[in-house]
A protein has these predicted regions:
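Catalytic core of non-heme Fe(II) oxygenases with the double-stranded beta-helix
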Residues: 89-177, 181-188
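Non-heme Fe(II)/2-oxoglutarate
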Residues: 1-97, 115
């Protein structure tokens, strides 16, 4: 069976793309979330915390071995080449060699009061995989006046320079997403 990548624009004229991930990749994602929960519940969890611009209750990088062995990585790099031009070998996940954050692929565990103010990312293409989103909490792209309430199993991608934000979460229900940044191989981190 051959997999056919189906991408849709979130809105006409908007560079945000949406795709539904195949079940085989969703199984990988479930294992990443399970791993993240184990670290989040560990007594030394704060040592592995991924810090960035936003406010999520807990963030941590997906281990490089899980990313490297995944079909998700192959799909995402092939999709990047389709969207940005060139060959999939022209792209890679942004990486921090020798650091516990390793790749720019991280889990976000969000609860009531969490939010991400308007920001952009480094790299060529960024994205979000929706793992759990019981209240369909949305990401907002102000330049295009469009929001997306990701259902589990969907992934969005957008040029890294596109401003976006996640408004304050108003419920106690856990929201779990995975964010990532992709760069051209010849670009610096």
């Amino acid at each position: 069976m051959e997999y056919r990548l189906e991408l849709e624009h979130l809105k006409e004229g908007c560079p945000v793309m949406v795709t539904k991930l195949p079940k085989e990749i969703l199984e990988e994602i479930v294992s990443w979330v399970k791993y993240g929960r184990e670290i989040k519940d560990h007594p030394l969890f704060m040592l592995r915390k991924h810090e960035n611009y936003g406010k999520n209750s807990y963030q941590l990088s997906v281990p490089s071995r899980m990313v490297e062995e995944s079909f998700w990585l192959a799909l995402t790099l092939r999709m990047t080449a389709t969207l940005c031009g060139g060959h999939h070998r022209d792209y890679k996940i942004r990486k921090w060699d020798g650091h516990f954050d390793s790749y720019d692929v991280w889990l976000n565990f969000s609860y009531k009061g969490d939010h991400n103010p308007e920001h952009k990312h480094a790299g060529s293409l960024s994205g979000v995989v929706y793992c759990e989103n019981p209240d369909l909490h949305s990401i907002y792209f102000p330049e295009y006046d469009v929001e997306f309430s990701g259902e589990p199993g969907t992934m969005i991608t957008f040029p890294s320079h596109v401003l976006h934000e996640v408004k304050e979460q108003l419920t106690d229900n856990e929201r779990v997403t995975i964010a990532f940044n992709i760069i051209r191989k010849d670009d610096a981190n």
